[in-house]
């Protein structure tokens, strides 16, 4: 029997596409965490901004919670619909809308995949420089909702730096046009930046105007083998002093083992405990000489044990696969993921402390580390032992996150660097944000989403949001 609320929605928005088949509910109701059982009311697939507004207004009238949905590649449970929410998928809003050659901006719908954004920019002789391994699956709206970073933050920064303007539907169904792609705008609060990183709890991004830039010069990729993590910052400093770095990524021997088992080619005859893949501007003899000088300095100091530099685009892709292939290689284990950040200078001490802490507390766990050294972001993947039940594993991993949160508080770090808080990390927001900050977040949500219907339960609990803040 069809739920009467679905019939009501069909009557309110007659042209709206709806999906209610069990397979669709499961597909659209979860993200890559695979931790919660999906249980959405239905899947709404609007074909216009006006339909998004109409759905949100209907949700307010019917008191139905709404979960905005993009590519659902998130790793924090931010797109999970497990409590009868209406999933509002933006996948049909997936087209480029406008290119402005003078402003060098590209306006796109929020459901457009990141890879399609890259292609659209490339067609104009420019680039949108934010990039990560899930580029073919993730949507630009989801990137904005989490202020995603990726592999080239060291050169280009996070998503936030490249958003010139937004169109956002608020929790009451109003449409906000934020900043209008202005370069300078000193006219009060910039609500664009409030929406970026808000995880769909304040509004639904429906369109984005993105800044584009010139294509980078030709680059080389170098893979370095390190004898210990303690020397990593010396290697980073040596290369940063000589070269314009595009990326500087690290991973462990355990990460490499999983990627090699997944079909990648071994880069060296011997296994080393730590690796760095770095990309830097090249194209002339001076840059190549600088790269070799940095490498030789590191070898002489004993900071690097071995290295290889790409001689072709194909070899560069092979070297990058060793880093970008980690997530795919680990996927079959359904790892418990943590995505944390500390100041770059604090990374060696933080990693040493947390490695020892996790080894002592959970010696049977296989912990795989990799991350973005250039911006202080570490990814910690815990793999379930075969002899451990899923329930016991999740319970133990919750304790892992608690230990990490306590360590991050000591190091003034963040429990989420780029994946967002979602459901996974909301119990540990205290390690990153003060009680006063969290109270202000709740107050802001109440103003923009007065019935607390947008992505409820994500980022923080909303049942106790204040009710005495004026909406006007």
Swiss-Prot record:
Biological process, per Gene Ontology: respiratory electron transport chain
Ranges where the FAD-binding PCMH-type domain occurs: 36-215
UniProt enzyme class: oxidoreductase
GO MF term list: FAD binding; metal ion binding; oxidoreductase activity
Residues reported to bind (R)-malate: 323, 327, 337, 419
Domain of life where this protein originates: Bacteria
Entry keywords, A to Z: FAD, Flavoprotein, Metal-binding, Oxidoreductase, Zinc
Name the record gives this protein: D-2-hydroxyglutarate dehydrogenase
Source organism: Xanthomonas citri pv. viticola (strain LMG 965 / NCPPB 2475 / ICMP 3867 / CFBP 7660) (Xanthomonas campestris pv. viticola)
């Amino acid at each position: 029997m069809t739920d009467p609320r679905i019939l009501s929605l069909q009557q309110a928005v007659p042209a709206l596409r709806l999906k209610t088949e069990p397979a669709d509910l499961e597909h659209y109701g979860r993200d890559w965490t695979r931790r919660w059982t999906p249980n959405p009311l239905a899947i709404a697939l609007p074909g216009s901004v006006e339909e998004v507004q109409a759905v949100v207004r209907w949700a307010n009238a019917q008191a139905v919670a709404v979960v905005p949905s993009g590519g659902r590649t998130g790793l924090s449970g931010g797109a999970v619909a497990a409590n009868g929410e209406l999933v509002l998928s933006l996948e049909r809003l997936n087209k480029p809308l406008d290119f402005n050659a003078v402003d060098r901006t590209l306006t796109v719908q929020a459901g457009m995949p990141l890879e399609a954004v890259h292609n659209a920019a490339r067609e104009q002789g420019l680039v949108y420089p934010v990039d990560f391994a899930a580029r073919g699956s993730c949507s630009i709206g989801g990137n904005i909702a989490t202020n995603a970073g990726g592999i080239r933050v060291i050169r280009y920064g996070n998503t936030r730096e490249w958003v010139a303007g937004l169109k956002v539907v608020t929790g009451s169904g109003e449409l906000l046009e934020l900043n209008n792609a202005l370069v300078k705008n000193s006219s009060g609060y910039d609500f664009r930046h409030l929406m970026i990183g808000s995880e769909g709890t304040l509004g639904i991004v429906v369109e984005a105007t993105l800044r584009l830039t010139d294509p980078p010069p030709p680059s080389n990729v170098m893979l370095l083998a390190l004898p210990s993590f303690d020397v990593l910052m010396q290697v980073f400093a040596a290369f940063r002093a000589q070269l314009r770095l595009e990326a500087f990524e690290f991973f462990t021997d355990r990460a490499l083992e999983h990627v090699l088992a997944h079909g990648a080619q071994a880069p060296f005859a011997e296994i080393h405990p730590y690796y760095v893949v770095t990309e830097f501007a090249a194209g002339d003899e001076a840059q190549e000489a600088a790269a070799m000088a940095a490498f030789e300095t590191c070898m002489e100091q004993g900071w690097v044990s071995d290295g290889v530099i790409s001689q072709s685009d194909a070899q560069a892709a092979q070297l990058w696969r060793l880093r970008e292939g980690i997530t795919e290689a680990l996927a079959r284990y359904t790892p418990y993921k943590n995505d944390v950040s500390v100041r770059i200078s604090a990374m060696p001490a933080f990693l040493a402390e947390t490695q020892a802490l996790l080894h002592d507390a959970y010696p049977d766990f296989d912990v795989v580390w990799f991350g973005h050294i250039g911006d202080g972001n570490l990814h910690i993947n815990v793999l379930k032992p075969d002899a451990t039940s899923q329930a016991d594993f999740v319970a133990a991993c919750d304790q892992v996150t608690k230990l990490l949160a306590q360590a991050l508080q000591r190091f003034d770090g963040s429990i989420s660097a780029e994946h967002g808080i979602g459901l996974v990390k909301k119990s540990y927001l205290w390690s990153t944000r003060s009680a006063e900050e969290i109270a202000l977040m709740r107050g802001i949500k109440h103003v923009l989403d007065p019935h607390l219907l947008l992505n409820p339960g994500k980022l923080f609990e909303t049942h106790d949001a204040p009710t005495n803040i004026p909406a006007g």
